[in-house]
């Protein structure tokens, strides 16, 4: 069953009206082409009006859409010869992180991504895209390998956050995330991070220390989920919509703040409308960024990442 949101209701009603007219025209053999064409033009305008003026909370809804493409959907459209590697060589294979090696535009690369499931059963297997420490250690193993063999690193971010259960804490969740941050800051190879859905807290940042940070048009990247923010600030998770506006976490906000380096255009309505078109835009943007970064020496790549991190946020000292 397709998932639709309240703000899409006018579009759905008009689509249904057009479908009914087309069916009626066919059944009764009546030419209703002028009326149908008029409604089609109105539908195009309505889609542009609604999807071109989405509020932050509406973008959150699209980023979480049950049919939103994940890494496995994009991989065959972005890469050749993707070979997945599993396990952290210490404890287990975390299914909320996927990674391996591939060919991107003729260049060998290492790719690492969060991944959610399709449906309840797979989401439980993948812990709804929330990695445990072994997931981040798997990512670190793959990125260390990329450094050893001088392969660029491409990460894809889509997680509500890191797993926060007792088992995750017992196995060193904070340490695992910190190791990823430390390692990514010091690598000599280009790193491009792309937020393809949710970018939640330290669980996202663990794959987010890059020379270039790109966001899909309807994705978001935040220190906290809007529901959690509302619970803390107003003791009311129902105020998530207000929190979403206050957090300034949309792709457009982050580009203005200098946290994002680019926005990847999505089809009207979201990436789930056409994974092929979204992947095409993604491939073009990543290829341009990679071509630029491959011209830079290792020291400059490290300095670039360090300065990017140090410029996140603002603070002022008061006596």
From Swiss-Prot:
Biological process according to GO: fatty acid biosynthetic process; malonyl-CoA biosynthetic process
Catalytic reactions of this protein: N(6)-carboxybiotinyl-L-lysyl-[protein] + acetyl-CoA = N(6)-biotinyl-L-lysyl-[protein] + malonyl-CoA
Keyword ATP-binding recorded: yes
Domain CoA carboxyltransferase C-terminal stretches: 35-292
Location in the cell: Cytoplasm
Catalytic activity, EC: 2.1.3.15
PROSITE patterns reported for this sequence: COA_CT_CTER (PS50989)
HAMAP family xrefs: AcetylCoA_CT_alpha
Family membership: Belongs to the AccA family.
Quaternary data: Acetyl-CoA carboxylase is a heterohexamer composed of biotin carboxyl carrier protein (AccB), biotin carboxylase (AccC) and two subunits each of ACCase subunit alpha (AccA) and ACCase subunit beta (AccD).
Function recorded in the entry: Component of the acetyl coenzyme A carboxylase (ACC) complex. First, biotin carboxylase catalyzes the carboxylation of biotin on its carrier protein (BCCP) and then the CO(2) group is transferred by the carboxyltransferase to acetyl-CoA to form malonyl-CoA.
Protein name: Acetyl-coenzyme A carboxylase carboxyl transferase subunit alpha
Lineage: Bacteria, Bacillati, Bacillota, Clostridia, Eubacteriales
Gene: accA
């Amino acid at each position: 069953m397709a998932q639709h949101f309240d703000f899409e209701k006018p579009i759905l009603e008009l689509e249904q009206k057009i479908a009914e007219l087309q069916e009626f025209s066919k059944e009764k053999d009546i030419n209703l082409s002028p009326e149908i064409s008029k409604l089609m033009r109105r539908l195009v305008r309505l889609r542009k009006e609604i999807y071109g003026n989405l509020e932050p909370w509406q973008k959150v809804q699209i980023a979480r859409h049950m049919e939103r493409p994940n890494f496995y959907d994009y991989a065959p459209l972005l890469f050749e010869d993707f070979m997945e590697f599993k396990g952290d060589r210490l404890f287990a294979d975390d299914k909320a992180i996927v990674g391996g090696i591939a060919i991107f535009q003729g260049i060998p690369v290492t790719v690492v991504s969060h991944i959610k499931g399709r449906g309840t059963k797979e989401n439980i297997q993948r812990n709804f895209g929330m990695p445990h420490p072994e997931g981040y250690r798997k990512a670190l193993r793959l990125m260390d390998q990329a450094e050893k063999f001088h392969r660029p690193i491409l990460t894809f971010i889509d997680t509500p956050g890191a797993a926060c259960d007792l088992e995750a804490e017992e196995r060193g969740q904070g340490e695992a995330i910190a190791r990823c941050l430390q390692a990514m800051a010091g690598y000599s190879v280009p790193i491009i991070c792309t937020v393809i859905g949710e970018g939640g807290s330290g669980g996202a940042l663990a794959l987010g220390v890059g020379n270039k940070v790109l966001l899909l048009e309807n994705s978001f990247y935040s220190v906290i989920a809007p529901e959690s923010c509302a619970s803390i600030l107003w003791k009311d998770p129902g105020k998530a919509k207000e929190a979403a506006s206050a957090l300034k976490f949309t792709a457009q906000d982050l580009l203005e703040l200098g946290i994002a380096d680019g926005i990847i255009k999505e089809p009207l309505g979201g990436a789930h409308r056409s994974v092929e078109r979204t992947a095409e835009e993604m491939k073009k943007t990543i290829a341009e960024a990679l071509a630029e970064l491959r011209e830079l020496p290792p020291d400059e790549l490290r300095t670039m990442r360090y300065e990017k991190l140090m410029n996140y946020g603002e603070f002022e000292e008061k006596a």
